[in-house]
């Protein structure tokens, strides 16, 4: 009644929302992926090494007709300079670092194995936080190291692997960013040092 008295229609439950996705134009991505894999059998056991690296050299979102119109409006002052983003040169902006790598080393002797691995990335920038000088906020490089130990045995005709491990060995926090979680949740893991036990039985 209060809505009608104010000349407004009462609101109710939203039954349908239409939000059409528009692919504004092409995105160009260039870079190099490299991988090094090496296994070595020795008198004391087997060593396995792996190193994978992804290096981006270009990540560019083309304007297209719609974005060009909006860009011209920003340059003329009709729209604020921060009205739209996510186009032009977006290399290392809001994710997609120039360099990401994964490195692991594993040693196995008989029924026992030890392993260590590391994930790392280079600096990325976010355009939601701009300094007075016009510079984007730099989200510093981040890397985490994990270690584990495996034991293999047979159980009722099946192969059992028992793993005890520690993730984020150095107990590092993800770098600060102005996202809803306080860090780039799509890029970094903010889980502190944690221990786990994993059992895998294969028949």
Write out the residue ranges for each language-model feature.
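Gram-negative outer-membrane beta-barrel transporters
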Residues: 1-128
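A cross-taxa feature marking solvent-exposed loop/turn segments within ectodomains of secreted
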Residues: 42-44, 140, 155-157
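Short, low-complexity, polar/charged sequence segments that are solvent-exposed and flexible
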Residues: 69-72, 133-136, 181-185
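Residues that define the transmembrane beta-barrel architecture of outer-membrane proteins
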Residues: 28-32, 97-101, 141-145, 158, ...
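C-terminal beta-signal and adjacent terminal beta-strands/loops
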Residues: 57-60, 117-129, 151-203
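Generic long, charged, amphipathic alpha-helical segments
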Residues: 118, 127-145
């Amino acid at each position: 009644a209060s809505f009608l008295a104010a000349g407004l229609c009462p609101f109710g439950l939203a039954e349908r929302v239409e939000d059409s996705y528009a692919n504004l134009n092409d995105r160009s991505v260039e870079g190099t992926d490299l991988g090094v894999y090496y296994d070595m059998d020795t008198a004391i056991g087997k060593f396995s090494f792996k190193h994978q690296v992804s290096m981006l050299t270009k990540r560019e979102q083309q304007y297209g007709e719609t974005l060009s119109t909006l860009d011209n409006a920003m340059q003329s002052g009709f729209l604020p300079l921060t009205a739209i983003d996510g186009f032009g040169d977006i290399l290392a902006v809001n994710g997609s670092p120039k360099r990401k790598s994964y490195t692991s080393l594993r040693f196995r002797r008989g029924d026992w194995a030890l392993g260590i691995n590391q994930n790392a990335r280079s600096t990325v920038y976010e355009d939601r936080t701009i300094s007075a000088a016009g510079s984007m906020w730099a989200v510093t490089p981040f890397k985490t190291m994990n270690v584990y130990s495996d034991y293999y045995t047979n159980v009722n005709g099946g192969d059992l692997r028992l793993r005890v491990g520690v993730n984020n060995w150095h107990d590092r926090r993800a770098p600060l960013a102005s996202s809803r979680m306080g860090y780039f949740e799509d890029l970094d893991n903010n889980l502190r040092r944690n221990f786990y036990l994993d059992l895998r039985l294969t028949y």
